[in-house]
Swiss-Prot record:
Claim: Isomerase is one of the keywords in the record: yes
Protein name (Swiss-Prot/TrEMBL): 1-(5-phosphoribosyl)-5-[(5-phosphoribosylamino)methylideneamino] imidazole-4-carboxamide isomerase
UniProt record similarity statement: Belongs to the HisA/HisF family.
CDD domains xrefs: HisA
Enzyme class of the recorded protein, top EC level: isomerase
Gene: hisA
Gene3D superfamilies in the cross-refs: Aldolase class I
Membrane found in the keyword field: no
Alphabetical list of Pfam families matching this protein: His_biosynth
GO CC term, one of those recorded: cytoplasm
Length: 247
């Protein structure tokens, strides 16, 4: 890999799904949805604008009220980009179903906190197709739709490192959907404690935020999930890709 390639911040525009619609939540709270049309329209929009990844979240599955698996399967089949899927992956059945949809990677959230032995086996079985989403409030992890505490971040990280986790998606839940800027200090602490790639999520509001995150790429920040700022028109995806070094 060349030096220039190493300085590229991978962008993952988000498509959050509730009841078959693409939505954005404020700080992950059910009932705070703003609708943005169909998931396929949203994902194709990002693909056409130059994305190589889409971060898709089945919020119904995350909140334990059914799932959008059939819809997601249809969307993935019509895309040429890689899809990272999150939401409601808590057992072998849901994990296998998600991977069978054709996604490139899945994010384990609550299950990684509540069932560490199952998580270890999933990582052993599927390797770098598994990322673990760490949703953080201070240094306390939030579980199950961000409504319950899930333990100390550094204790859980040590356990996941021991299990061989390949990648972490780190969200400061106090920032998510707020356009208040990412938690750079949290990301710095994360990359200091793991040699694995870290994907940043939550709070990205401006091209300047992306410039700051790109400076962390040599330290181990691999990418950034961008949601509300794109939907709200703070910047376009092509503009963001320019700043991230991809175009």
């Amino acid at each position: 890999m060349t030096t220039s390639a190493q300085s590229v911040l991978e962008l993952l525009p988000a498509v959050d799904i509730v009841d078959g619609q693409a939505v954005r939540l404020l700080q992950g709270e059910a009932g705070s949805e703003t609708s943005y049309g169909t998931p396929l329209e949203a994902a194709l929009n990002w693909q056409n604008d130059g994305a190589e990844w889409v971060h898709m979240v089945d919020l119904d599955a995350a909140f334990g009220r059914g799932n959008n698996a059939a819809l997601i399967s249809d969307v993935v089949s019509q895309l040429n980009v890689k899809v990272e899927l999150s939401g409601g992956l808590r057992d072998d059945e849901s994990l296998e179903r998600a991977l069978e949809l054709g996604v490139a990677r899945v994010n384990l959230g609550t299950a990684a906190l509540e069932n560490p032995e199952w998580t270890r086996k999933a990582i052993d079985r599927f390797g770098d197709k598994i990322a673990v989403g760490l949703d953080v409030r201070g240094t306390t992890l939030a579980g199950r739709g961000w409504t319950k505490e899930g333990g100390d971040l550094w204790e859980v990280l040590a356990r996941l490192e021991d299990a061989g986790c390949a990648r972490y998606v780190v969200t400061d839940v106090t920032k998510d959907g707020t356009l208040q800027g990412p938690n750079v200090e949290l990301l710095r602490q994360m990359v200091e404690k793991t040699g694995k790639p870290v994907v940043a999520s939550g709070g990205i509001s401006s091209l300047e935020d992306l410039r700051v995150l790109r400076e962390l790429v040599p330290l181990g920040v691999e990418g950034a999930i961008v949601g509300k700022a794109l939907y709200a028109g703070a910047f376009t995806l092509p503009e963001a890709l320019d700043v991230a070094g991809r175009r």
